[in-house]
A protein has these predicted regions:
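A short, hydrophobic, proline-anchored segment that marks a local hinge/packing element in signaling
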Residues: 109-116, 125
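Conserved small/polar residues in nucleotide/adenosyl-binding loops
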Residues: 137-142
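Hydrophobic alpha-helical segments, chiefly the membrane-spanning helices
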Residues: 32, 149-153
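Short, Lys/Arg- and Gly-enriched loop/turn segments at beta-strand edges
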Residues: 101-107
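Long, charge-dense accessory insertions within large macromolecular proteins
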Residues: 2-48, 52-71
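Short, ordered coil/turn segments that flank beta-strands lining enzyme active or ligand-binding pockets
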Residues: 49, 116-117
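Short clusters of small/polar residues that mark proteolytic maturation junctions
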Residues: 58, 125-126
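Regulatory sensory and allosteric helical modules in signal-transduction proteins
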Residues: 49-56, 68-97
């Protein structure tokens, strides 16, 4: 195992935290949704290629806690096995599956894999509340039973 001196470790950790804080500020600046710029109903994090969270912003635990599972499931789905292409530069993964790391269908996770030298380096991830994701008249319809009625999987 490689050891890292404490100063280098702290510089790298704070650098990753700064990236996540800048992600958060950029999303607020660019958002047209009051759920984001008024209610802060979103969360940001960075993940390594093994789906381990390496940095997160000070956000909602209900968003942040299940995000590693969402990233893991996305990596599993796009692993290059079972006939799929695998994750490649330029891909963007959008998911809201309540059974694979989602919270409810309106919390949509966006992953943008970043490659360095042709190798997957890091996954910036954002989970945000999307007010009207459903296929029916309202995303909170109490009489809907199948998950697909509320927004598709």
């Amino acid at each position: 195992m490689t050891t890292v001196d404490p100063i280098t470790l702290e510089v790298v950790c704070e650098g990753m935290r700064a990236i996540v804080k800048e992600m958060r500020a950029s999303i607020i600046r660019a958002s047209f949704s009051s759920a984001i710029y008024e209610l802060d109903d979103f969360s940001c994090a960075l993940f390594n290629p093994q789906a381990d969270m390496v940095a997160q912003s000070d956000d909602h635990p209900g968003h942040v806690m299940p995000m590693p599972w969402s990233v893991f499931c996305a990596m599993e789905d796009f692993s290059g096995q079972d006939g799929n292409e695998g994750i490649e530069p330029g891909d963007v993964i959008l998911l809201n599956d309540a059974y694979r790391g989602g919270t409810h269908l309106n919390d949509v996770t966006l992953l943008y894999p970043v490659f360095v030298g042709g190798e997957l380096f890091i996954f910036p991830a954002v989970r945000a509340h999307w007010a009207d994701v459903c296929l029916l008249y309202t995303s909170d319809a109490a009489d809907d039973t199948p998950c697909v009625d509320l927004g598709g999987r």
